[in-house]
């Protein structure tokens, strides 16, 4: 009897792109972030990708003290793999962005694979009533912002986090980012299996047409062969459609309110767990199985939760 392919669902419950005024369902406080992570894990997310926010006004923070308020609880109450951001926010320095990953030494950390324009300002057209002053600045300032991820930055993250046994979710927003990863593979600084998160539909990166997805996959196949584990992240309204196309073609999937506030056109998702449930239905509808956290650890060759610092 043929063995069904296992599909890893990653869930990103809060992130640093969206702001509290955009959705009443966006987790802000440590309690809310913890609740969202646990609910997503219960629905089948094997990996939880985490950012933190200031509990008073929801602005992104990389203060390890805030992460400390929810990480131990999540680890104690579920077996999901914890993936911490090193992207933080495009408005932060690399040193700021790395504080949580250096301190907590997670099994997985995200790693953005190239500097890029990171255009959030079009959201001002949809969301005109903003509660906090920082929200408008956060969006408007992205018109003249380069999200800095130089070769030196990437090398430093690879070596400093890698020394703690942390492996990476390589976030590739464009074709060039795949070539950047190949450069570090050639230098021996990135080891297989490579967990490649292909990101589609963010202004400044590759588009969200199925042909863009196909081009990403062909390029990754040519560069990495069988040495990579592929995952799809579609931004905004592209989340479920692109993840569905990808899963049908052999990818894993990432969902969550970090990446999209929507559950269907014009309807806000009431939780990241609802998005996990929706993509799980697609996966199981294709006669595939979702990967458990233990299976995800084996697929990605992770060090295990016992070897983290939280």
From Swiss-Prot:
Binding residues for Zn(2+): 49, 51, 258
Keyword Transferase assigned: yes
Listed cofactors: Zn(2+)
Gene3D superfamilies found in the cross-reference section: Aldolase class I
Domain of life: Bacteria
Keyword Acyltransferase: yes
Pfam families noted in UniProt: BKACE (PF05853)
EC number(s) per entry: 2.3.1.319
MF (Gene Ontology): 3-keto-5-aminohexanoate cleavage activity; metal ion binding
Keywords: Acyltransferase, Metal-binding, Transferase, Zinc
Job of this protein: Catalyzes the condensation of 3,5-dioxohexanoate and acetyl-CoA, forming acetoacetate and acetoacetyl-CoA. May be involved in fatty acid biosynthesis rescue via triacetic acid lactone.
Family label: Belongs to the BKACE family.
Protein name as catalogued: 3,5-dioxohexanoate:acetyl-CoA acetone transferase
Provenance organism: Paraburkholderia graminis (strain ATCC 700544 / DSM 17151 / LMG 18924 / NCIMB 13744 / C4D1M)
Taxonomic placement: Bacteria, Pseudomonadati, Pseudomonadota, Betaproteobacteria, Burkholderiales
């Amino acid at each position: 009897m043929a063995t069904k392919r296992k599909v890893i669902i990653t869930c990103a419950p809060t992130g640093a792109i969206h702001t509290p005024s955009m959705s009443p369902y966006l987790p802000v406080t440590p309690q809310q972030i913890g609740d969202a992570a646990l609910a997503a894990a219960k629905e089948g997310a094997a990996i939880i990708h985490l950012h933190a926010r200031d509990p008073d006004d929801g602005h992104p923070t990389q203060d390890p003290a805030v992460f400390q308020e929810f990480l131990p609880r999540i680890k104690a109450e579920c077996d999901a793999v914890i993936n911490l951001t090193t992207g933080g926010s495009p408005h932060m320095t690399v040193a700021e962005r790395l504080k949580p990953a250096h301190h907590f030494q997670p099994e997985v950390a995200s790693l953005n694979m190239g500097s890029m324009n990171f255009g959030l300002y079009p959201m001002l057209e949809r969301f005109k009533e903003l509660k906090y002053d920082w929200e408008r600045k956060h969006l408007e300032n992205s018109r003249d912002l380069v999200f800095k991820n130089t070769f030196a930055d990437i090398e430093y993250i690879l070596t400093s986090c890698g020394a703690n046994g942390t492996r990476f979710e390589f976030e590739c927003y464009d074709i060039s980012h795949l070539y950047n990863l190949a450069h570090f593979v050639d230098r021996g600084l990135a080891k297989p299996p490579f967990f490649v998160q292909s990101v589609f539909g963010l202004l400044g990166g590759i588009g969200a047409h199925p042909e863009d997805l196909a081009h990403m996959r062909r390029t990754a196949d040519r560069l990495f062969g069988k040495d990579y584990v592929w995952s799809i992240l579609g931004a905004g309204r592209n989340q479920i459609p692109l993840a569905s196309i990808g899963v049908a073609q052999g990818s894993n999937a990432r969902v969550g309110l970090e990446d999209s506030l929507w559950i269907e056109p014009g309807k806000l998702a009431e939780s990241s767990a609802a998005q996990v449930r929706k993509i799980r239905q697609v996966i199981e509808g294709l006669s595939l199985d979702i990967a458990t956290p233990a299976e995800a650890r084996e697929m990605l060759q992770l060090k295990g939760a016992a070897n983290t610092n939280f």
